[in-house]
Amino acid sequence: MARITGNKGEWSELYVLIYLLAHGKLNAADGKLNKLRDIFFPVLKVFREDVKGEKVEYRLPDPADKRVITIFLNNEQICEISQSDMEREQKALYWSIVNGAGKAFSIDGIEQVMSDLHCSKIKAVNTDKADIVLQLHDINTGYSPICGFSIKSDLGSAPTLLNAGKTTNF
């Protein structure tokens, strides 16, 4: 696998994936984006499609279970990884992003983690409107909707609501 580089915002997309796999929950936030520790949605599944036609699904364990995440490729189980391994990788990745120098940088050892996760890219495919797709469980209603989320990172420069580029046209 070639050396992967990205900016802090791009690395943050991979960080969010690993964080959610490690902790199995998505916390709510207040109007100022402060984390509400006691209000969260359990994450049941995370979905990615880095390569067209290759749908990767991460099924998170019930909190009472053995803390093992099951990975499926096109609905076929391919491997398992432990949440404790993801927790360790999440902490290391966080500090690598915070300490990353330059506009784009690489992170030592990340290729193996990505290979273990069957992840070939650090960020979502540009054609997707959502950066990450999750199946959450709403403990208040009992529903388990599939929701897409956009990821905006505060680890580098302040995030913008609009990513200006060649296709941005007013």
Language model features with spans:
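An N-terminal, globular interaction/scaffold subdomain
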Residues: 5-8, 14-112
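Short loop/turn segments at secondary-structure transitions that flank enzyme active sites
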Residues: 26, 138-140, 153-158
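Short N-terminal edge-element motif at the start of the domain
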Residues: 103-129
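Extended alpha-helical scaffold and adjacent linker segments that couple domains
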Residues: 77-81, 85, 116, 122, ...
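Short acidic loop-to-beta-strand element that houses the catalytic metal-binding Asp/Glu
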Residues: 45, 127-137, 146
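Glycine- and acidic
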Residues: 1-3
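Conserved catalytic cores of phosphodiester-cleaving nucleases, focusing on short active-site segments
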Residues: 20, 132-134, 147-153
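Mg2+/Mn2+-dependent nuclease catalytic core
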Residues: 145, 151-170
